[in-house]
């Protein structure tokens, strides 16, 4: 069984390089092919291609349409291996489609291909342990789960859990990172399976059958909360679980500036977090939208309390956009790209 490993990049060739090197050490019992998509435009795609060449990957002749990509290239390692991503494909998105849009480009192209029995969605700023994929596949098969997540640890504190998945908290209107700061060597708590609403979007596995059942990721979020919605859909339709032996080290926020500190976060991450919380609730729990709107607005003032007026403004703008029902790419941050 071969897995399609999908990585969405945005002008981060060095992150992708380190991720590929970690993947090169993967367990040979879980073969996979790597499918990259560059959301950052032609210059970023050229930098990605240059990085692949510098890593010793050899371009292979490719015949056929590039659609739905603007450009498409195929590479292979000098020595074909059953694991470590012997086949590497790199596609240029026609525009910046966001996280789900990038994932879905490859899912649409790969879904008809019977070679792939599952899909591993992985962030570029991650370093998976050698057995991370094997553990995901094993857990999916053991329990008949359609979607399985990894446990994440940070690069700075690998001995502590960053998250073992997400749980939506309707009263405070935000997701909880499950078992955050718990020692990584400790097993998950007995209640985690019931509390789990979604995996971390940085590393999770989806079976071919699950994709047929729940469909692709919802692209209207652009960034943030699309993984939470997909997880809830999987939980209801085909089963959701954590693979506790699948460990992935994660930088977090490398592309969007999603630092955990309110003052350090980028305006983009703050804006989308507040906009998309309302969008998520409108789609999944519409009856709770009035309460969510009040809570999210009230919490914007926390940015003023920590001396971050710029992020307070971004939060209020995001909240207002969410209240108006705005979705997709926020042109106030990306409008200059469309003009190129």
Predicted segments with their positions:
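Short beta-strand-to-loop acidic/aromatic patch adjacent to the donor-nucleotide binding site
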Residues: 115-127
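Glycine-rich, basic loop-to-helix element that forms the pyrophosphate-binding segment
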Residues: 70-76, 85, 92-111
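Short, well-formed alpha-helical segments that are part of the catalytic scaffolds
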Residues: 12-25, 47
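A conserved acidic beta->alpha catalytic loop
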Residues: 38-71
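Non-catalytic, C-terminal membrane-associated alpha-helical segments of glycosyltransferases
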Residues: 268, 273, 285-340
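Acidic/His-rich active-site region of diverse nucleotide-sugar glycosyltransferases
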Residues: 52-57, 84, 92-95, 127, ...
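Short, acidic, metal-binding catalytic loop of nucleotide-sugar glycosyltransferases
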Residues: 21-31, 54-56
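A short, conserved alpha-helix in the catalytic core of glycosyltransferases
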Residues: 197-216, 220-247
